[in-house]
Design a protein with these regions (language model features):
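Periplasmic/cell-envelope proteins involved in peptidoglycan metabolism and beta-lactam response
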Residues: 1-176, 183, 192, 267-275, ...
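Beta-lactam-recognizing serine transpeptidase/beta-lactamase-like catalytic domain environment
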Residues: 60, 155-196, 202-424, 441-443
């Protein structure tokens, strides 16, 4: 009798072990089977080391990459291929955030019931939100300079342009050892760069909401070209003379913003970098942007002043700054970006700034264009912008231009960075104009 009991217990233990193992396998199968299916050793979906199923289109239906043949067939135009290389990707997965890498499971068409089987055997189509013609315009506008252009619809979240340079031809990719630095990075998504004066839009938001309105209205600063804090010189490009809050932003006066940063304080500046989404990573159909990083030393007024100007240890992700531009355009809330044209609905961000703050920033950004950049340089565009000239050790400044246009049919925010170049409005501004003119006027 005892033997039977022992055998029953042993069988029960074995059954529990079997059930536990089976449960663990089912759990992992449900959770991870999509990644198992798209491993390189799966000959059903890979051929000669590259994906052998699925096609990638842009938002207008232009075929960007066809994986279904013996080799990957890309769009015919070389410039278009290079303008969209980091967005579309290549057969070898050099760009981890590209469609060929990030949307591999969609291209394969995997699901739990049928696996990778499809009636056609050709996988699925993926339609990106980018417009390849806009990307080509951005690529040509950047020329041979390193940089990036990002444009998105601040009402729907659709990213219509994300172009990075230097780039490569996915039909004939270079050896990774010989490629220029940044070639295989989508800088719009994965980059972190010193922002320079475009960060003053964050400092301005903090000033509006943290400094009493009566004091901010009376704010005045006499710029002589050099402002000293604790024996350290903070320089401007020129002596701006007497400036108020609005004038300080229009003239991008470092001295004035150093003083504003001191009044706001390190803790509040840090809080607003977070509130404005600059330390946020957004889920864009499964692709995540890099987080920006910022330091605001509590007991170091000099470093806090530099940080509020957009220097010191400020490192900005362009995608997150673009979303903040959307918040200013949208009365304080923005829309999470999307990389797929087929992605329906919209996901709003949390409120970044008050609606009244957004309205005031819009007014100030419009004043920037009128007073400093020249509306005639952006003909036909109702543009709101801030330039930036970020000092980078060992090279010329990085030129920035960020903002949005107010147009019922074309509600787009933009960000441009031209590395190792010069002044923001003089270098990055014309790039933004060329891209926006093409979007609005097709020319």
């Amino acid at each position: 009798m005892r033997k039977l009991e022992h055998r029953a217990v042993l069988l029960l233990i074995l059954a529990l072990i079997l059930f536990s193992g089976l449960s663990f396998f089912v759990f992992r199968y449900v959770r991870e089977s999509d990644s198992w299916a798209i491993k390189y050793y799966n000959s059903h979906v890979f051929r000669n080391g590259h994906l052998a199923t699925g096609r990638v289109f842009d938002r207008k239906g232009t075929l960007m990459a066809d994986n279904t043949g013996k080799t990957i067939k890309y769009v015919d135009d070389t410039t278009t291929r290079m303008a969209t290389a980091q967005a579309v990707g290549d057969g070898y997965g050099f760009v981890s955030t590209s469609a060929e890498s990030a949307f591999r499971d969609r291209l394969v068409g995997y699901n739990l019931l049928t696996g990778t089987y499809s009636i056609s055997g050709l996988g699925n189509d993926v339609r990106l939100s980018i417009d390849s013609d806009v990307c080509r315009t951005a690529y040509n506008a950047l020329g041979y300079r390193s940089g990036l252009v990002g444009v998105y619809n601040y009402k729907t979240g659709q990213v219509i342009c994300m172009t990075s340079t230097p780039s490569f031809d996915p039909a004939d990719p270079p050896d990774t050892k010989n490629a220029k630095s940044g070639t295989f990075m989508n800088k719009f998504i994965s980059g972190n760069l010193t922002p320079g004066s475009i960060f003053k839009l964050v400092t301005s938001a903090a000033a509006i909401e943290k400094i009493p309105a009566s004091k901010l209205k009376k704010f005045s600063f006499r710029c002589t070209g050099v402002h000293e804090i604790d024996g350290v010189s903070i320089r401007c490009t020129q002596a701006h003379g007497e400036v108020d809050f609005e004038g300080a932003l229009a003239k991008s006066c470092n001295g004035a913003f150093a003083e504003l940063s001191r009044k706001i304080g390190a803790r509040s500046l840090s809080a607003y970098a977070q509130k404005c989404g600059l330390e946020t990573t957004y889920d864009m159909n499964g692709v995540h942007n890099a987080k920006g990083t910022f330091e605001f030393p509590v007991n170091d007024e000099v470093s806090t002043a530099w940080a509020g100007i957009g220097q010191w240890k400020d490192y900005l992700n362009p995608c997150s700054m673009l979303v903040y531009m959307g918040a200013i355009a949208n009365d304080g809330k923005s829309v999470v970006p999307k990389l797929l044209a087929t992605s329906t609905g919209r996901r709003d961000t949390r409120r970044m700034i008050k609606a009244s703050t957004a309205r005031r920033l819009r007014k100030m950004m419009k004043n920037n264009v009128k007073v400093s950049y020249g509306e005639n340089n952006y003909p036909g565009l109702d543009i709101y912008a801030k330039s930036g000239t970020a000092e980078v050790e060992g090279q010329r400044p990085n030129a920035w231009f960020a903002g949005f246009i107010k147009n019922k049919n074309y509600p787009y925010a933009f960000i441009v960075c031209v590395e190792d170049s010069g002044f923001g409005s003089q270098v990055a501004g014309p790039v933004a104009n060329l891209v926006l003119q093409y979007i609005v006027n097709g020319e």
